[in-house]
């Protein structure tokens, strides 16, 4: 995406209103601080700073993968508990698609969201990242069916994202078949 510079805009820039509504929350502009980290004390400190910034700037915030919460580690839960610093922020939880298939049903997915006060949940797709990690999840069979089942049963908005390789046309066509609230298209390039 490239923007063309318009040096003679013929408008009052102070009159431009970028506010939008996403999942029932009003944002100052169509911006979301993307998922980066979570699970450890240090990650919790980063999340708190970012969530407070999201609150101050009135933009959304997406948690890093909540996979560490599945082990019920106290520091993991604490690192994702941010409502005290971001009470009105659009807050989105996040779990991997393989974890959805292997460990979670709709009720557990909803419980993950409720545990952190999330307004919705992302399910992240990352087969390329997993393929190059020695300990990565290499079996992706049944992930689409698990995603479909969760989307049909969960009582919170469900969104899908890719963590660094983007969503191709075939994947988007598959996702269009599901009753999900949306997809994040910022996947190419990760958090850069």
Pin down the residues of each PLM region:
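An N-cap/entry alpha-helix motif that binds or orients negatively charged groups
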Residues: 1-23, 27
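Residues that cap or initiate secondary-structure elements
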Residues: 7-9, 39, 67, 99
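Short secondary-structure boundary/capping elements
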Residues: 14, 42, 46, 73-74, ...
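Short, charged beta->alpha transition segments
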Residues: 14-24, 47-52, 75-83, 108-112
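Active-site cofactor/substrate anionic-group-binding motifs, chiefly glycine-
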Residues: 21-72
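Short, basic, glycine/proline-bearing loop/turn elements
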Residues: 32-37, 65, 93-97, 156-158
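Alpha/beta enzyme core
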Residues: 51-56, 84-91, 98-192
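A gly/proline- and charged-residue-enriched helix-loop-helix capping module
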Residues: 56-97
């Amino acid at each position: 995406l490239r923007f063309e510079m318009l040096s003679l805009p013929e408008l009052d820039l102070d009159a431009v209103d970028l506010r939008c509504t996403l999942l029932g929350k009003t944002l100052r502009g169509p911006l979301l601080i993307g998922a980066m980290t979570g699970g450890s004390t240090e990650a919790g400190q980063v999340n708190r700073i970012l969530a407070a910034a999201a609150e101050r700037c009135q933009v959304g915030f997406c948690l890093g993968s909540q996979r560490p919460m599945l082990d019920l580690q106290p520091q993991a839960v604490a690192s994702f508990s941010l409502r005290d610093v971001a009470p009105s922020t659009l807050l989105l939880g996040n779990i991997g698609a393989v974890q959805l298939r292997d460990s979670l049903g709709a009720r557990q997915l909803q419980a993950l969201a409720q545990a952190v006060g999330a307004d919705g949940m992302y399910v992240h797709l990352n087969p390329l990242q997993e393929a190059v990690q020695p300990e990565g999840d290499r079996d992706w069979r049944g992930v689409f069916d698990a995603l479909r089942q969760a989307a049909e049963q969960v009582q919170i908005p469900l969104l899908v994202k890719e963590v660094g390789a983007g969503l191709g046309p075939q994947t988007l066509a598959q996702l269009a078949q599901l009753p999900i609230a949306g997809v994040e298209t910022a996947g190419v390039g990760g958090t850069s």
